[in-house]
């Protein structure tokens, strides 16, 4: 979760830490229940620039964006995944990305993808994309 000046939700450090801890417990529990060998990790609350810095070591960086090119590009990117890469997913804020953020993310190797015609809630977009990635890369 990235804190931005335009963020609607304002979290203090204590609340943010407790939310991340809770989300990671949910992620671990869900992974065990579904017999996943890899547990998705929820990173600490940070600024947008800190998130870009943390993402430098990732193999694949996916940035769902409502104005991204059509499904063909997204499908190709997902189909070309080998299944053993480290993948980062950058879910946008309630109000969307601003152009400066998009530009910085692209400079750092993030690929804009689309999740379709509908604009999903922040809470569901990540789960939707994780589900698609798991389905497409099931071995």
Language model segments and positions:
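Short, charged, surface-exposed secondary-structure boundary motifs
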Residues: 11, 72-75, 122-126
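Generic beta-sheet signal
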Residues: 45, 64-66, 115
């Amino acid at each position: 979760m990235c804190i931005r000046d335009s963020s609607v939700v304002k979290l203090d450090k204590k609340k943010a830490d407790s939310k991340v801890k809770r989300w990671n417990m949910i992620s671990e529990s869900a992974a065990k229940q579904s017999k996943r060998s890899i547990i998705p990790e929820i990173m600490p609350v940070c600024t947008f620039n800190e998130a870009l810095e943390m993402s430098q070591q990732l193999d694949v960086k996916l940035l769902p964006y409502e104005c991204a090119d059509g499904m063909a590009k997204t499908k190709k990117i997902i189909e070309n995944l080998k299944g053993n890469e480290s993948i980062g997913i950058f879910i946008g804020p309630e109000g969307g990305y601003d152009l400066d953020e998009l530009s910085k993310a692209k400079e750092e190797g993030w690929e804009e993808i689309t999740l379709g015609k509908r604009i999903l809630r922040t809470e569901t977009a990540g789960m939707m994309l994780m589900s698609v990635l798991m389905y497409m890369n099931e071995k």
